[in-house]
Amino acid sequence: EALDFDRWWPDRSRPLTPKGIKRIHREAEGLKRLSLAFDLILSSPLERARQTAKIVAQVLQLEDRMVEIEQLAPDQSVRDLLSGLAAYAAKKQILLVGHEPLLSGAVSFLLSGKTGAQIQLKKGGLCCLELDGIPAHKSAMLQWALAPKQLRLLAR
């Protein structure tokens, strides 16, 4: 949850609300319970995404594995994002922290070859894709998806 767009300009510097920070922390605690091992956390350079990535990295004790990439900014295309991810192809498990509709578009493209395949991630949601090599259309298999509420329930 970010502060109101109308009251915060420029959008790149718009932070999470105190409620949003609390929710992300609980979701990160739920993520920790899954015992996933991330090689890298890639984040959008926008403030609210950076805050989210930092909270997750702290909870998972992965602060040294955070990298910001412009290709996760909301004004980028799915093609830009996938090109940016190619630089990290040697990494096995990467957590992406970005924005909608870019992330849903990328997931849709990787699963179906189309960016509008009705895949929708909620703010703070998470999905796991298994990729076969460098990201290309129809190269992924969805392993699981969790809504933010499910992650928060795992934290209990």
Give, region by region, the residue ranges found by the protein language model:
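Active-site-proximal alpha-helix that buttresses catalytic centers in soluble enzyme cores
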Residues: E1-L72, Q76-R79, S83, A117, ...
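Generic beta-sheet signal
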Residues: A90-G98
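Domain-level recognition of soluble alpha/beta enzyme cores
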Residues: L111-M141, A145-P148
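Short, cationic low-complexity segments
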Residues: K149-R156
